[in-house]
Curated annotation (Swiss-Prot):
<keyword id="KW-0067">ATP-binding</keyword>
<dbReference type="InterPro" id="IPR012725">
    <property type="entry name" value="Chaperone_DnaK"/>
</dbReference>
<feature type="region of interest" description="Disordered">
    <location>
        <begin position="583"/>
        <end position="626"/>
    </location>
</feature>
<dbReference type="GO" id="GO:0140662">
    <property type="term" value="F:ATP-dependent protein folding chaperone"/>
</dbReference>
<keyword id="KW-0597">Phosphoprotein</keyword>
<keyword id="KW-0547">Nucleotide-binding</keyword>
<feature type="compositionally biased region" description="Acidic residues">
    <location>
        <begin position="609"/>
        <end position="626"/>
    </location>
</feature>
<feature type="modified residue" description="Phosphothreonine; by autocatalysis">
    <location>
        <position position="175"/>
    </location>
</feature>
<dbReference type="InterPro" id="IPR013126">
    <property type="entry name" value="Hsp_70_fam"/>
</dbReference>
<comment type="similarity">
    <text>Belongs to the heat shock protein 70 family.</text>
</comment>
<dbReference type="GO" id="GO:0051082">
    <property type="term" value="F:unfolded protein binding"/>
</dbReference>
<dbReference type="InterPro" id="IPR043129">
    <property type="entry name" value="ATPase_NBD"/>
</dbReference>
<dbReference type="InterPro" id="IPR029047">
    <property type="entry name" value="HSP70_peptide-bd_sf"/>
</dbReference>
<comment type="function">
    <text>Acts as a chaperone.</text>
</comment>
<keyword id="KW-0143">Chaperone</keyword>
<dbReference type="GO" id="GO:0005524">
    <property type="term" value="F:ATP binding"/>
</dbReference>
<feature type="region of interest" description="Disordered">
    <location>
        <begin position="498"/>
        <end position="517"/>
    </location>
</feature>
Length: 626
């Protein structure tokens, strides 16, 4: 039976954790780091690179490197590489497969089950896309849980027995969430974590702060050189990396230098060099509008929960972007001067909470109950384009609601059920989740047929909808025709492709190892022959040298089987070197032993004739001692 893990599938970085002896442990990746960049690249040879190695080569491979794909989850966005269109689910699956491989190497056993986190404000299509990514990666997705909820789960387990109200402020690389949760513990140490309200912005994160710096640098270059870098992909990638680094440095310093050589060339051939100083004050001024966008979700959460700032007991910061001093100051201002809790690692706490939830679902931990909510209202379009809500936002999940509707026209044979998610009054202003048709309605005057529409939201926050004609008993379940929901056969195809790519990568790695071993063996054998030429017969030396050359020739090609065959033949021939050297050594040892025996016999004879000398010496010693 495989292990269960918790995965924080982030915009910028991802993290994986598991339970060891009931306690959550963050798993280090193959590079020895505790987080993995959510970057996927396709090398010119077709190899798929993931993580730090993909991030490092981004400048030289801009068009084939994908980052921040989380922002495209739940959309019909695709990227074409070598004639194949890749969906956000498939790109995300590559990140998950890397995390899975590294976890299996770390744990020494298969990883089969996972709890994967997503932003609290993700809609149904985005949640389904996240779940599909896990499936494509070969994982059984136990649950999709909200990132702030996972963070509160990790934080809450370390607290005492008192009931507390926690505000989680989660600003990541691409998304922003605010959640209010109540954590209660009974005398037996059983924790109940209940989400009271959640709000957010799925297009606000550290990437936007980076973009402000990039735009400023592009403007500075344009003013100084008259060169527009906004269309130069390689220059933009270099600026992106510099902007990210500058943002990080400004969290601990009041100014930073951005220096880059040969960014581009002017029309007259002058190289474009960049050497700018960015102060924290200037950075905060240029990003003040982004900071302002954090206020509305915060205020909405307090309003929805019906509480004041004074009712918040603790504030927990999640996501690397909360390290920015301006963000910390904003949180302090919004919460009436409360200092944020610093006891959790903002980069790891979400994965830790997901690992705890995986243990709860698998039965490894029985001391916690998690009650989450749906972040957005759900409803259908009714006459006049009105959004009729069946489930209000911040309703505890799982939940199920039904309502009876009727026809708008006489003898209407079918009804089109259009499902939406959002808070606006008119359906057109909300997010369409999908459409399905209930047909075969018996002829009747308008308003007579009774059509029961049922919304069912599971523990993952994923929506299932059905409609039933109460007169005929005819029922129809929702199949997504809008949004980005992938049909099962498409997911199955992607799973097979992902497995095939993994098999290709594994074979490529094995082939590289075979080649390296063969090169090393050829070098060592050649050196052995050269070092022992005087001890080897010409026949042996020539035979081995010929086999070394055959292996070297095979290594120039791509035929791995030919390399293996040549290496095997060289190994057989190389054994003759050992035989020759050992035979020569054996002869030398035998000659040495015979010489030693002769010397011993001669020594005995001479000792017999010199007895008086030896005796005299012994007597003299005795006399000295006396």
């Amino acid at each position: 039976m495989g292990r269960a893990v918790g995965i924080d599938l982030g915009t910028t970085n991802s993290c994986i954790a598991t339970l060891e002896g009931g306690q959550p442990t963050v798993i280090v990746n193959a590079e020895g780091a505790r987080t993995t960049p959510s970057v996927v690249a396709f090398s010119k040879s077709g190899e798929i690179l993931v993580g730090e190695v993909a991030k490092r080569q981004a400048v030289t491979n801009v068009d084939r490197t994908i980052s921040s794909v989380k922002r495209h989850m739940g959309t019909d966005w695709t990227v074409e590489i070598d004639g194949k269109k890749w969906t956000p689910q498939e790109i995300s699956a590559q990140v998950l497969m890397k995390l899975k491989r590294d976890a299996e190497a770390y744990l020494g056993e298969p990883v089969t089950d996972a709890v994967i986190t997503c932003p609290a404000y993700f809609n149904d299509a985005q949640r389904q896309a996240t779940k599909d990514a896990g499936t494509i990666a070969g994982l059984n997705v136990l649950r999709i849980i909200n990132e702030p909820t996972a963070a509160a789960l990790a934080y809450g387990l370390e607290k005492g027995k008192e009931d507390e109200r926690i505000l989680v402020f989660d600003l990541g690389g691409g998304t922003f969430d605010v959640s209010l949760l109540e954590i209660g513990k009974d005398d037996d140490g059983f924790s109940t974590i209940q989400v009271q309200a959640t709000n957010g912005d799925n297009h606000l994160g550290g990437d936007d702060w980076d973009q402000k710096i990039i735009d400023w640098l592009v403007g500075e270059v344009k003013n100084k050189y008259g060169v527009d870098l906004s269309k130069d992909k390689i220059a933009l990638q270099r600026l992106k990396e510099a902007a990210e680094q500058a943002k990080k440095e400004l969290s601990s310093s009041t100014s930073t230098s951005i220096s880059m050589q040969y960014l581009a060339m002017t029309p007259d051939g002058t190289p474009v060099h960049l050497d700018e100083t960015l102060t924290r004050a200037h950075f905060e001024e240029m990003t003040s509008d982004l900071l302002g966008r954090c206020r509305t979700p915060f205020n909405n959460v307090l309003r929805d929960a019906g509480i004041g700032v004074s009712d918040i007991d603790h504030v927990v910061l999640v996501g690397g972007s909360t390290r920015m001093p301006a963000v910390k100051e904003l949180v302090k201002e919004l919460t009436g001067g409360k200092e944020a809790n610093q006891s959790v690692n903002p980069d790891e706490v979400v994965a830790v909470g997901a690992a705890v939830q995986s243990g709860v679902i698998k039965g490894d931990r029985k001391d916690v109950l998690l009650i989450d909510v749906t972040p957005l209202s759900l409803g259908i379009e009714t006459k006049g384009g009105i959004m009729t809500k069946l489930i209000e936002r911040n309703t505890a999940i799982p939940t199920k609601r039904s309502e009876v509707f009727s026809t708008a026209e006489d003898n209407q044979p079918s009804v089109l059920i259009q499902v939406y998610q959002g808070e606006r009054e008119f359906a057109r202003d909300n997010k369409p989740l999908g459409t399905f048709e209930l047909t075969g309605i018996a002829p009747a005057p308008r308003g007579v047929p009774q059509i029961e529409v049922t919304f069912d939201i599971d523990a993952n926050g994923i929506v299932h909808v059905s409609a039933k004609d109460k007169g005929t008993g005819k029922e129809q379940s929702m199949t997504i025709t809008g949004g980005s929901g992938l049909p099962k056969d498409e997911i199955d195809r992607m799973v097979k492709e992902a497995e095939a790519h993994e098999a290709e990568d594994k074979k490529r790695k094995e082939d590289a190892e075979t080649r390296n071993q063969a090169e090393s063996f050829a070098y060592q054998t050649e050196k052995l022959v050269n070092d022992n030429k005087d001890k080897l017969s010409d026949d042996v030396a020539k035979e081995v040298t010929d086999k070394v050359n055959e292996l070297k020739e095979a290594l120039k090609g791509e035929d791995i089987e030919k390399i293996k065959s040549a290496q095997t033949e060289l190994m057989t021939s190389a054994q003759k070197i050992g035989q020759a050297l050992y035979a020569q050594q054996g002869a030398a040892d035998a000659a040495g032993a015979a010489g030693a025996a002769g010397a011993g016999a001669a020594g005995s004879a001479s000792n017999g004739s010199d007895d008086d000398v030896v005796d005299a010496e012994v007597v003299d010693d005795d006399k000295d001692n006396k």
